């Protein structure tokens, strides 16, 4: 059977103060009253049954997840006791699916992306399922066909086409986020896709890869499934590492018996990682300011202005250029746009000097 796991962990620190530890970005109802999590679920409707959709999130967010997706059975919401990077969410989820269905094929999708059109996404995901079902040793990643030399995404280098499928290729190598000139060369070559961070595989195949690469992790997630009452004891033993570093990159380099393949996603895709990507969804005024909420500007241009307090509050600026201003009821952020990637550092200082309730 086919399963989908929505990965909805993380605190979304780069979107502070909109996103907080107690209310991370995937739960914020910023998009016409819907959250990124709800939108991720709705993209799956008609593709798999609700009984086969799971969400892996932080334990502290499990209640909110259940409220936002009431269609899911309670046992399909997996609450991590602590965040330990993407591999462990993936590995635990795969172990849960394998325990329920040894023949289960599972897609790991993320809850922090905007994807249109949905029917094209479903078509590509269905192809990835078909590939994983037909080729038991396949690790199938989804690659977004790039439309610009984006420097904020990782890339994958595709090689020869896989016979019997359309828009399916072998992956030669994974690439880190490039500088502008290198990203342009990737785009010009036509051989590189953006790494969407979504994969499809047989649950037992992923666990078999971990047996080869990280046997302690494989053994621990199996033990968690066998003895769920011990999760608080066992989960902290898992190594903090991403699934790309732990599995996908070694497999693509031939260090395991798996084949790494990719299915093309020809979609409008935005990974909502920080304010620069979020601003792409906002309305821009005649001065190039991306605005959300009630704002007034004077001699200000190229800014990102967010008023999350409400209609009884106004954010007003004078003489700002390329600035970021985010106002919430309990915290306000003012920064240069070029420093937006440093918000993590700032949040650590806020936690230390102002208190955890503001972080």
Model-derived regions: residue spans:
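Conserved N-terminal catalytic core of the sugar/cofactor nucleotidyltransferase
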Residues: 1-7, 13-24, 29-126, 134, ...
């Amino acid at each position: 059977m086919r399963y989908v796991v929505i990965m909805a962990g993380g605190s979304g620190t780069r979107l502070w103060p909109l996103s907080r530890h107690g209310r991370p970005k995937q739960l914020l109802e910023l998009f016409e009253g819907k959250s990124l999590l709800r939108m991720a679920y709705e993209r799956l409707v008609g593709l798999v049954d609700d009984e086969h959709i799971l969400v892996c999130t932080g334990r502290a967010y499990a209640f909110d997840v259940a409220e936002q997706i009431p269609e899911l059975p309670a046992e399909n919401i997996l609450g991590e006791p602590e965040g330990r990077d993407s591999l462990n969410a993936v590995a635990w989820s795969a172990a849960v699916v394998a325990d329920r269905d040894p023949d289960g094929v599972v897609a790991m999708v993320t809850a922090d992306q905007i994807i249109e059109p949905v029917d094209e996404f479903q078509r590509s995901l269905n192809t990835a399922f078909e590939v994983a079902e037909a080729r038991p040793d396949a690790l199938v990643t989804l690659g977004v066909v790039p439309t610009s030399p984006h420097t904020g995404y990782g890339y994958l280098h595709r090689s020869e086409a896989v016979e019997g499928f359309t828009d399916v290729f072998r992956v030669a190598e994974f690439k880190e986020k490039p500088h502008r000139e290198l990203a342009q060369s990737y785009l010009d070559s036509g051989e590189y896709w953006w790494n969407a961070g979504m994969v499809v595989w047989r649950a037992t195949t992923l666990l078999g890869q971990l047996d080869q690469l990280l046997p302690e992790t494989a053994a621990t997630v199996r033990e968690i499934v066998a003895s769920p009452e011990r999760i608080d004891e066992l989960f902290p033993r898992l190594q903090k590492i991403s699934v790309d570093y732990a599995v996908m990159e070694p497999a693509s380099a031939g260090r395991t018996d798996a084949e790494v393949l990719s299915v093309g996603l020809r979609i409008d895709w935005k990974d909502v990682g920080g304010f620069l990507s979020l601003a792409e969804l906002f309305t821009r005024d005649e001065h190039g300011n991306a605005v959300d909420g009630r704002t007034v500007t004077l001699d200000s241009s190229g800014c990102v202005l967010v008023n999350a307090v409400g209609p009884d509050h106004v954010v007003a600026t004078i003489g700002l250029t390329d600035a970021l201003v985010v106002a919430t009821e309990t915290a306000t952020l003012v920064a240069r746009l070029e420093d937006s990637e440093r918000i993590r550092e700032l949040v650590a200082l806020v936690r230390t000097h102002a208190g955890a309730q503001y972080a």
